């Protein structure tokens, strides 16, 4: 495999972000959504996101999707957000708004290239990655929100839900060639070790697990909290990686970013797991496989971002933003025997039901 000839499966992640100026985005906001105000480009990976600030202080996020984005998948994301708002109106998730014609997505020509445009809520605050030491209350709040999100999505389906995405844990085996692109031999060996564990212990059981539509990307950059009092979660963002997959995968993704890197890695994540389990109890098999899935998410993070950073060196800093903590998490998990980690997860879950 070469860096620049990805299979169709990787097309969305391999495609370059669109080229749209803030002035073009401002004009689209005015013409198609009736919003007049300042426009600022925000950081992003495969899409372009613009903050629209109107004269009355109202703020919105205008998203211009990657040219490789399937309109059916975009509609899947839109309908999921509307479904969540209907099932759990108080859940702090991103909102989507219709354009002037009542549609939730529109195709706009930018310099001759057709691109999907959507409008979302913009919530003031700071992303969770900027909170230096998230306390127990915040980690518990995050676990509760993720569990509620899973409950709100239960029973939701859409023709686009079956799309394939490299960030989907159930497809982790397809990373083998990309692990070979990791230059450091020790890091490459560590990633391969945990991918082997996934294939040996978790993959054979995936089809027997509860499955539904999941958020699939609860990383700290997708969680907004209050800068002055970061205990309650203010907003969960970015539903662009949603897939239909085992429900426990959603928890594994979230826990992967809550691990401690000093001493026992799961101790730091315990409040998150307990809070989730209290609202959406894990089944015994899910508890047993959770540590394998957590490690596999970390492997996805270091492997996919390493590959994409090589493709787009100009955006390397943003693409690799979660990689250092992911490597620390993998090293910490490598020091804990699998059976010990499984016992600890069972104990964390049982403590909440005593």
Q: Which residues does each predicted region cover?
A:
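An alpha-helical support segment within catalytic cores of ATP-dependent transferases
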Residues: 19-29, 155-158, 174-216, 226-228, ...
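Active-site activation/catalytic loop segments of kinase-like enzymes and analogous catalytic loops
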Residues: 247-281, 295-313
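A glycine-centered beta->alpha junction motif in the catalytic cores
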Residues: 102, 113, 117-131, 172-182, ...
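Juxta-kinase regulatory segment immediately upstream of eukaryotic protein kinase catalytic domains
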Residues: 1-35
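Active-site acidic catalytic loop and adjacent metal/ATP-binding pocket
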Residues: 45-57, 61-62, 96, 199-249, ...
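ATP/Mg2+ or Mg2+-diphosphate-binding catalytic cores
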Residues: 3, 181, 301-354
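A cross-family kinase active-site recognition segment
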Residues: 100, 131-189, 211, 293, ...
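A conserved alpha-helical element in kinase catalytic cores
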Residues: 64-112, 131, 136-140
């Amino acid at each position: 495999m070469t860096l620049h000839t990805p299979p169709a499966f990787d097309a969305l992640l391999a495609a370059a972000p669109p080229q749209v100026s803030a002035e073009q985005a401002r004009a689209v906001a005015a013409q198609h959504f009736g919003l007049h105000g300042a426009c600022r480009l925000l950081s992003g990976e495969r899409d372009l996101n613009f903050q629209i600030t109107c004269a009355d202080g109202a703020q919105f996020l205008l998203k211009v999707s990657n040219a490789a984005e399937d309109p059916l998948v975009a509609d899947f994301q839109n309908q999921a957000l509307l479904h969540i708002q209907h099932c759990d109106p108080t859940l702090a998730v991103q909102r989507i708004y219709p354009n002037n014609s009542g549609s939730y997505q529109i195709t706009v020509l930018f310099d001759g290239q057709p691109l999907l445009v959507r409008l979302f809520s913009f919530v003031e605050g700071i992303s969770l990655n900027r909170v230096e030491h998230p306390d127990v209350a915040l980690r518990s709040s995050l676990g509760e929100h993720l569990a509620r999100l899973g409950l709100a999505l239960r029973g939701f389906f859409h023709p686009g839900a079956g799309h394939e995405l490299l960030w989907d844990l159930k497809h982790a085996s397809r990373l083998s060639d990309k692990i070979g692109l990791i230059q450091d031999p020790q890091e490459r060996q560590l990633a391969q070790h945990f991918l082997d564990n996934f294939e040996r212990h978790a993959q054979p059981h995936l089809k027997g697990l509860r499955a539904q539509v999941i958020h699939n990307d609860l990383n700290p950059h997708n969680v907004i909290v209050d800068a002055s009092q970061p205990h309650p979660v203010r907003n969960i963002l970015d539903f662009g990686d949603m897939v239909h997959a085992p429900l426990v995968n959603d928890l594994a993704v979230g826990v992967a970013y809550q691990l401690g890197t000093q001493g026992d890695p799961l101790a730091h994540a315990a409040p998150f797991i307990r809070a989730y389990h209290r609202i959406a109890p894990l089944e015994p098999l899910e508890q047993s496989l959770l540590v394998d899935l957590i490690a596999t998410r970390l492997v996805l993070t270091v492997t996919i971002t390493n590959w994409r950073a090589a493709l787009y060196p100009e955006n390397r800093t943003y693409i690799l933003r979660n990689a250092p903590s992911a490597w620390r998490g993998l090293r910490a998990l490598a020091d804990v025997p699998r059976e010990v980690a499984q016992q600890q997860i069972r104990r964390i879950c049982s403590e909440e039901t005593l």
